[in-house]
Amino acid sequence: MIRIGHGFDVHKFGGEGPVIIGGVAVPYEQGLIAHSDGDVALHALSDALLGAIAAGDIGRHFPDTDDKWKGVDSRELLKDVYRRVKEQGYKLGNADVTIIAQAPKMAPYIDAMREAIAHDLETDIRNINVKATTTERLGFTGRKEGIATEAVVLLIKQ
């Protein structure tokens, strides 16, 4: 049996950089405003994993009303989510993450993001794809007000 999950997240810029995305610190003049470290890529990926096992979203499991999660490293959240996936008898088939941002430029950091995600999801890097695109200066991402990310995962019953 296979299951598919989709996730989406967005955070606006504010404060000081760097931007933490895909488990990697990307130099930029601003960071992302969030209760956790604001890693939109890992938040979308975590939501996709939770969606695939019909377990809600990260807001349900790690609410921003709980100070326990204030400033938390999103890689720890992702690992916890993947533990839940494995408890349901699934493993990751593949994941595809799309980062939507006018800035900062992501290309130099994509390989490091893939490595971090593959490590945290206990899989081969060939099962992880990360790509970045812009909105051609349209909308809030085009105006450099924030970053959005979408993620899709395929889970395989073990």
UniProtKB/Swiss-Prot annotation:
Task: Provide the species name.
Answer: Vibrio vulnificus (strain CMCP6)
Q: Mind listing the GO biological process terms from this record?
A: isopentenyl diphosphate biosynthetic process, methylerythritol 4-phosphate pathway; terpenoid biosynthetic process
Cofactor: bound how, per the entry note?
A: Binds 1 divalent metal cation per subunit.
As its record notes, the protein acts as a catalyst of:
4-CDP-2-C-methyl-D-erythritol 2-phosphate = 2-C-methyl-D-erythritol 2,4-cyclic diphosphate + CMP
- The record's top EC class is lyase
Q: Report quaternary structure and partners.
A: Homotrimer.
Instruction: Specify the pathway.
Output: Isoprenoid biosynthesis; isopentenyl diphosphate biosynthesis via DXP pathway; isopentenyl diphosphate from 1-deoxy-D-xylulose 5-phosphate: step 4/6
Its protein name is 2-C-methyl-D-erythritol 2,4-cyclodiphosphate synthase
Its signal peptide is none
Q: Which family does it belong to?
A: Belongs to the IspF family.
Annotated GO MF terms: 2-C-methyl-D-erythritol 2,4-cyclodiphosphate synthase activity; metal ion binding
Binding site residues for 4-CDP-2-C-methyl-D-erythritol 2-phosphate: 9-11, 35-36, 57-59, 62-66, 101-107, 133-136, 140, 143
Cited PROSITE patterns: ISPF (PS01350)
Q: What does this protein do?
A: Involved in the biosynthesis of isopentenyl diphosphate (IPP) and dimethylallyl diphosphate (DMAPP), two major building blocks of isoprenoid compounds. Catalyzes the conversion of 4-diphosphocytidyl-2-C-methyl-D-erythritol 2-phosphate (CDP-ME2P) to 2-C-methyl-D-erythritol 2,4-cyclodiphosphate (ME-CPP) with a corresponding release of cytidine 5-monophosphate (CMP).
Q: Where does a divalent metal cation bind?
A: 9, 11, 43
